[in-house]
């Protein structure tokens, strides 16, 4: 039994199983025993097997024959076990001159042990003989058989085994004695500890008596603390060592988990790549759809702009018509006044009133058309605002989709780069592993080559010795033959009997010489054959070594190429990162440009909204002008007639409209005003105006309506410009110097300001409350709800109220 030195075998998988007593050659058809040792680094399994492989195998399937490895009895995990397998002779290979080796293969197909190479050769008489030096320190060589040599070795090993067993028994006895001593020492230590505790208790009791005992007690405490600290330190060291072992195990488990996670993440990344490709296609389709929608929205915006231009042209046209109608109305009022001055007949007044009513109907119709056009304009502006908002949201969605598409493309590129890098890493790892395997095989082949070379040198020495021995034997034989010839020549003439005897003796040395020559020739032939075989095997091994070197060079070149490819991939990854940074910068610039466009569009929308408000305010001012003209013309006539003393009697029944008012249903008011119908229109009394300018003539404002017309905003409720004329005729312009009408418009002011008391209101103050505050300063007629300025003459106001009770004036319900 050969002893072997323990080394850290966990570094190589081929050293987890060690094969013992492997010979250099075995008989082909004889039973073969395989001795091997299972190290603590392998866990046996019933499906493990030992196979005979030809040298140069690549996988576990290249076995020649195999036997199942038996499960060792009473196996303890982490211990070494010796096992034996017996291969039957008819399963073994023949004498083919190839090298074989034992390999231990696990149930997972992993090769965990390999033996030294050996051959299967038939025994020859020369091979059974061995030469060895004499143990008696003599220069002679002793020729023995292999069996004898092996028996001697077995006897020596058995003796060594017996000696080792005796030594083991002695060592076991010594260990038992040492264990008993350790137990005794531990008991003594425990006894001493108990005694120490007792002494400490006694010392604590005596501390109150003497100060010296206190000092000794402190010294004992210090010693005890040192011992305990050492014990704690040792315990901590033990705990740290155990923690390190546990950490190593956890690191191994974590590495396994990381490997599993990496495989799982690889599968997830492949799935994610597929999904991202699908999302990329969907993004492309969505991008195309959004571009189509953008084009549609742009076309709709263009059509709405065209409609807006058409509406503006229609509004300008109607404004021109309103101006023309105002001029016509002014001319008609002038004609009415001239007719009132020239004639006082009822028929003329009826005709003039009829014309005035028709003009008022036309003005009212145009006013309703203006209101409808304002509604349509507001609807068009709202539609345009909605389309602009939709366009803005579509652009934002488009930019968002583009950003997502760019991010997806970048992620795809990064994933592709990561996968390529992983592939290169795995390939590099595999190539390195193959190079290490080839280096190991080269080392094994070199060792085998050295052994064969040494054997060849030894055989060459034996051949030289045999040739020297044969030459010496030939020289001795020739000397003997020469001496014998001389003796024969000397005794020829003496006795014929002796000559006959010499003749009879002569053939015996020739036969011995012939036998010796035959034996030496046979040995020389066998030695030459063996030398030829050895040289052939040497050449084969040399060729294999050269092939392995060529393969190593080839793999080294491939490794260099793979490193170059990896560097190129790294450069490509850096370029891709730079491109991504440039794309991000361009995208940020595009975002800034889009923000500028959005800000420009918002400013444009604000300008459009301001223009819209200006248009509405202008329309409202035009409406107020028309209302002021319609209401101020009879009021001026009334005041002039009152001052001159002329009162015209009007019939109680108002004329009915010839074609009716087509906008009567839409002209309804809320509150106390009610609806204006032709038969319910009430006017103040009219008298002949006098053009004297001595007294102050006040043109009162029309009655203010507390309700808003349909389709108009709060900021555009019935307001009138302060600089607007009260009447279009020259007399009204002259009267403007004595009394002016009240008008305010809050759409142009940031804060609302009362024009009478100078009180400021916030911009978001309710318009109806603001109007109530302003109206509270005015004098209101309790009958007709007509408003008068605060500085209006009280007597004139009372006279106005009294006119409602006159018999010649229409009653106001």
Swiss-Prot record:
Keyword Lipid metabolism: no
GO BP terms in the entry: apoptotic process; negative regulation of apoptotic process
Binding site for Zn(2+) 2: 781, 784, 800, 804
Gene3D superfamilies, per database record: 2.60.40.2840, 6.20.250.40
Biased composition range(s): Polar residues: 489-502
Modified residues (Phosphoserine): 124, 138, 225, 617, 633, 690
Annotated spans, Oligomerization: 320-420
Family matches, as PANTHER family: SKICH DOMAIN-CONTAINING PROTEIN, TAX1-BINDING PROTEIN 1
Record note on domains: The C-terminal UBZ-type zinc fingers function as ubiquitin-binding domains.
Official protein name in the record: Tax1-binding protein 1 homolog
Source species of the chain: Pongo abelii (Sumatran orangutan)
Gene from which the chain derives: TAX1BP1
């Amino acid at each position: 039994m050969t002893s072997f030195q323990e080394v850290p075998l966990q570094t190589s998988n081929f050293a987890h199983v060690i094969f013992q007593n492997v010979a250099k050659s075995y008989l082909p058809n004889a039973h073969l025993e395989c001795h091997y040792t299972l190290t603590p680094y392998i866990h046996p399994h019933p499906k493990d097997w030992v196979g005979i492989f030809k040298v140069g195998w690549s996988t576990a399937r290249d076995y020649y024959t195999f036997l199942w490895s038996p499960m060792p009895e009473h196996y303890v995990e982490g211990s070494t076990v010796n096992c034996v397998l017996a291969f039957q002779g008819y399963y073994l290979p023949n004498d083919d001159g190839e090298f074989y080796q034992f390999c231990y293969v696990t149930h997972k197909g992993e090769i965990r042990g390999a033996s030294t190479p050996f051959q299967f050769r038939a025994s020859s008489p020369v091979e059974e003989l061995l030469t060895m030096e004499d143990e008696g320190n003599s220069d002679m060589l002793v020729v023995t058989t292999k069996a004898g040599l092996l028996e001697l070795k077995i006897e020596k090993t058995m003796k060594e085994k017996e000696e080792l067993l005796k030594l083991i028994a002695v060592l076991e006895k010594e260990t038992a004695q040492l264990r008993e001593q350790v137990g005794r020492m531990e008991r003594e230590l425990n006894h001493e500890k108990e005694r120490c505790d007792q002494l400490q208790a006694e010392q604590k009791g005596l501390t109150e008596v003497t100060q010296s005992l206190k000092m000794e007690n402190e010294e004992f405490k210090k010693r005890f603390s040192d011992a305990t600290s050492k014990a704690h330190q040792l315990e901590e060291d033990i705990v740290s060592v155990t923690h390190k072992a546990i950490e190593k195990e956890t690191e191994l488990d974590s590495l396994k988990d990381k490997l599993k996670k990496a495989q799982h993440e690889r599968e997830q990344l492949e799935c994610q790549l597929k999904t991202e490709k699908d999302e990329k296609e969907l993004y492309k389709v969505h991008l195309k759809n959004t571009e189509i929608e953008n084009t549609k929205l742009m076309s709709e915006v263009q059509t709405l702009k065209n409609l807006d231009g058409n509406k503006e042209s229609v509004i300008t046209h109607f404004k021109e018509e309103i101006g023309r109608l105002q001029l016509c109305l002014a001319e008609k009022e002038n004609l009415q006044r001239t007719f009132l001055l020239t004639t006082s007949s009822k028929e003329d007044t009826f005709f003039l009133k009829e014309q005035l009513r028709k003009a008022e109907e036309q003005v009212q119709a145009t006013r309703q058309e203006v209101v409808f056009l304002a509604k349509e304009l507001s609807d068009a502006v709202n539609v345009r605002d909605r389309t602009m908002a939709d366009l803005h949201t579509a652009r934002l969605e488009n930019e968002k989709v583009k950003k997502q598409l760019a991010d997806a493309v970048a992620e795809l590129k990064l994933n592709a780069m990561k996968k390529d890098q992983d592939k290169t890493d795995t390939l590099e790892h595999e190539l390195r592993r193959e190079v290490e395997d080839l280096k190991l095989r080269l080392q094994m082949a070199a060792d085998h080559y050295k052994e064969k070379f040494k054997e060849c040198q030894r055989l060459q020495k034996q051949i030289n010795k045999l040739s020297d021995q044969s030459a010496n034997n030939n020289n001795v034989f020739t000397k003997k033959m020469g001496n014998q010839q001389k003796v024969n020549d000397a005794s020829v003439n003496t006795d014929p009997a002796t000559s006959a005897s010499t003749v009879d003796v002569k053939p015996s040395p020739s036969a011995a010489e012939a036998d010796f020559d035959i034996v030496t020739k046979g040995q020389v032939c066998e030695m030459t054959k063996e030398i030829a075989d050895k040289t052939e095997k040497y050449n084969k091994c040399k060729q294999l070594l050269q092939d392995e070197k060529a393969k190593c060079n080839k793999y080294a070149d491939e490794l260099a190429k793979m490193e170059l490819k990896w560097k190129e991939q790294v450069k490509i990854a850096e370029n891709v990162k730079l491109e991504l940074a440039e794309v991000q910068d361009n995208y940020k610039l595009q975002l800034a440009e889009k923000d500028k466009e959005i800000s420009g569009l918002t400013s444009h929308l604000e300008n459009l909204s301001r223009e819209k408000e200006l248009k509405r305010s202008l329309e409202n001012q035009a409406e107020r002008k028309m209302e002021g003209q319609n209401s101020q013309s009879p009021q001026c006539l009334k005041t002039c007639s009152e001052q001159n003393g002329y009162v015209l009697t009007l019939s109680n029944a108002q004329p009915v409209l010839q074609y009716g008012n087509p906008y009567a249903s839409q002209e309804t008011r809320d509150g106390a005003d009610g609806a204006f119908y032709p038969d319910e229109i009430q006017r103040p009394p009219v008298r002949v105006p006098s053009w004297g300018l001595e007294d102050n003539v006040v043109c009162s404002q029309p009655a203010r309506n507390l309700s808003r017309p349909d389709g108009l905003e709060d900021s555009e409720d019935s307001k009138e410009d302060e600089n607007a004329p009260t009447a279009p005729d020259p007399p009204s312009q002259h009267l403007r110097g004595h009394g002016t009408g009240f008008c305010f418009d809050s759409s142009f002011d940031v804060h609302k300001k009362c024009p009478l008391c100078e009180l400021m209101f916030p911009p978001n103050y309710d318009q109806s409350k603001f109007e109530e505050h302003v109206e509270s300063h005015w004098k209101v007629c309790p009958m007709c709800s007509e408003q008068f300025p605060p500085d209006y003459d009280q007597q004139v106001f009372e006279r106005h109220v009294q006119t409602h009770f006159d018999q010649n004036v229409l009653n106001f319900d």
